[in-house]
Amino acid sequence: MRVAKKVQGSRFLGVVFVSALVAAGCGAGGDDESTDEATATTEAVVTTTEAPAATTTTTEAAPTTTEAPAITTTTEPPLGWQKILAGDDCACSDGSEYSYWVREGDPSKVMLFFDGGGACFSAESCDPNGSPTYSIRADDNPNEAASGVFDLENPENPVGDWTMIFMPYCTGDGHLGTNAGHDYGEGIIINHTGFLNGLKGFDEIVANYGTADQILVTGSSAGGIPVPLFAGLLADALPDTEILGLPDASGGYPSNPLINGVIGGVWGTEGAIPYWSTTEGVTAAEMGIPELFTYAGLEFPDIRWARFDHAYDGTQASFSALAGLEDSSVKAVLDINEGLTEDAGVDLPVYIAPGTEHTIMGRAEMYELEVEGVRYVDWLTDFIAGEAIDDVVCTDCGAPS
C-alpha cells in the first residue's frame, strides 16, 4: 500500500492520511509482538507476556490490609528497553527482520529517536559484500547505550525520565525510503524502506501515547534527516500535543534538485510525501533538508525547532562528496540551509560547534560541550522547557587545513 503521494493538500486529506498511516506501513499489527531479548543491566524489563490477566471470582477471600505492602511507584526505577518485532513486512536492506525498542518512562513526555548509520544510492555503495556505506542490519541496541540522552543516570539529562522510542536504521535511505527490492544490477537488491519502518514509531506513539503532553522528535546523523517529516506527521495526528523537532548532525547537506531527484527516485522518497497543503505538487526533487523543515513548519506553525551540527562535520562532508557535491563546505551549507528555512518563515535556532566531529545527542560530549559561553546541555534543556533560545555559533570554528 502506498501511504503517501503528491496530491492537493487540505486539512481533510491530512486527517485521512494520518488515519491511513496508523493502519499502513509495514507489518500491520506487529507492534504488539515483543521478543525475549529485552534486557537491561540493572533495570526491570516488561514484556507483553510478563503479567497474565488475573482470573478472580466472587468467592475468593478478600485481601486484608496487611496482605500486601503498598506499591510506591514514585521510587521504582524506570523500566528497561523492550524490543518489539515490527512485523513480517518490515525489513532491513537485506531482508532481515526489523525491530524497534521502547523504554517506558513518563507517559506524558515521549522522545522518538531515529538512529543513524550512513546511506547508499549506487551498486558500489550499497553492495553488502563490498564496502557498504550504511548499516545493513538493525543491530544497534539501546541497552548498550549509556551516553548523551541515553545516560539515564545523569541528573542533567533533560529527557532522562521520559518514555523513549528508539528506531534502528538499516535501509541506507535516511529513513525516507518506500522502495522495497530496488535492483541496482549485479545481483544487488536493496530494501530502501526506512520511512515504512519508521512509521512503526509513529504508530507506537499514536496508539499508546496519544495523550502525551510533549513529544521530542530527534535523531543523529542519517537519523536527523527525517525529523521534520515525522514531527509534522505527529503534529497532524496529535494536535493537542506539543511537538519539538531537533535533528542532530544532518543540517549540512546541500539541497540540489537534480541530486534530490536521482537519489529520491532510488529510495522512493515520493512515497513519503504527506498530504499537506504545503506539499502540493512536491516531487522527490524538492525533498531536501531545508524543504522538509519548510513543509512541516509552515503546515504546523506550533512545532518548535532547533538543530545541532559541527561546523566542519567530516561525515557530512564525505557523504556530500559521495553524492557528487565535492565543492560543498559544511559550514557554508549549514548557513545556507538555516537561511532558506528562516526566509520561508520557520524559526530555526541552531547550535554550531567547532571542528569535524559528528553527532552529539548520543555522546558524553552532550554534557561537556560549551560554545561561546553556552553549554549545549543547558541550551537543549531550555529548548525542551520552552525557554527562548538564540543561535549559538562558533567564531573560531576550526576549519580543517
Language model features with spans:
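Sec-dependent N-terminal signal peptides
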Residues: 15-20
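Bacterial signal peptide processing site
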Residues: 27-30
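C-terminal His-loop and adjacent cap/lid subdomain of alpha/beta-hydrolase
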Residues: 67-401
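C-terminal motif of bacterial Sec signal peptides marking the signal peptidase cleavage site
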Residues: 22-25
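Extracellular mucin-like PTS domains
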Residues: 34-76
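Bacterial N-terminal signal peptides that target proteins for export
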Residues: 3-14
